[in-house]
Amino acid sequence: MKLNFPLRLLAAASLAAASMFAQAADVTVAYQTTVDPAKVAQADGAYEKATKADISWRKFDNGADIIAAIASGDVQIGYLGSSPLTAAITRKVPVETFLIATQIGAAEALVARDGSGIKTPQDLIGKKIAVPFVSTGHYSLLAALKHWNIDPSKVTVLNLAPPAIIAAWKRGDIDATYVWDPALGVAKENGKVLITSGELAKFGAPTFDAWIVRKDFAEKHPEIVTAFAKVTLDAYADYRKDPKAWLANQSNVDKLVKLSGAKASDIPLLLQGNVYPLAADQVTTLGAPTTKAITDTATFLKEQGKVEAVLPDYAPYVSAKFITN
């Protein structure tokens, strides 16, 4: 009898543990080094607490790699820009766009290196410009060249990931780059901003970042996607309620610096340069506006030879059902 009680207790504990693990889901989330308020929630473990999921956070340098990981099933939820998202959807990768993370403003820009001889857009002709291919930066670069009536064939566009851009910039191997932080911050140290994504948006070429999820994962774990979206939007609301007070909290800035690699002094400008849509905005945006933006992006990418065709309808790849007010 003395042995049975501990054994029964152990069996009960094992059953409880098994039940707990059965309820918890393993999910791999792909993130990038963009600066946004939700990175504080990421650093604080708020996503794990709200979703009750075992989350593995994986850092990626560009959206194209994230799409490849999602398509293979290695990643279930990912953060990427509108250009790689559009390219993926056009190729019918089974994903849903469930949250607009940011409408990109000053957080991405085209910078010309000091000493490159580039003072005006026309000076880009014959120069080397680095950008991660199929990224929002790539889309914006092509849109900027079109706006300035510069034939893309008259510049040398190099496909480099952000870490490689930083190295090439420091060596003086490239003349300009269209990129985001931390590479953007490095470029601005000895370079001139020619145009930002926010300015390009006014010329009819807006870009945005979004959170997407594999459709099969969303169907199996809708509660996780809903909780994930709520944590993100709560973080946005906390920032937008009083941006100055939020930035005055050094802990918030430190967490952004750690996860983004951006300089603390650049954080205010990067945050203020973007728009972080709240829940009410999401419900409206995750419909015709986003579908139209993706369609317009696909049309542009087809003109540039980056995708073979434009789908007749992108609505099945965009959903507001995971947004709770």
What are these regions (language model features)?
Residues 25-151, 156-159, 175-181, 197, ...:
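Short, glycine-/small- and polar/acidic-enriched structural segments
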Residues 18-24:
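Sec/Tat signal peptide C-region and signal peptidase I cleavage site
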Residues 51, 74, 79, 89, ...:
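Sec/Tat-exported extracytoplasmic proteins
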Residues 219-306:
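Secondary-structure end/capping motifs
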Residues 83, 164-257:
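Pocket-lining segment of extracytoplasmic ligand-binding domains
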Residues 48-52, 199-203, 277-289:
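Short, solvent-exposed loop/beta-turn-alpha elements that line the ligand-binding surface or hinge
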Residues 1-11:
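Bacterial N-terminal signal peptides that target proteins for export
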Residues 299, 303-325:
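Hinge/cleft segment of the Venus flytrap/periplasmic-binding protein
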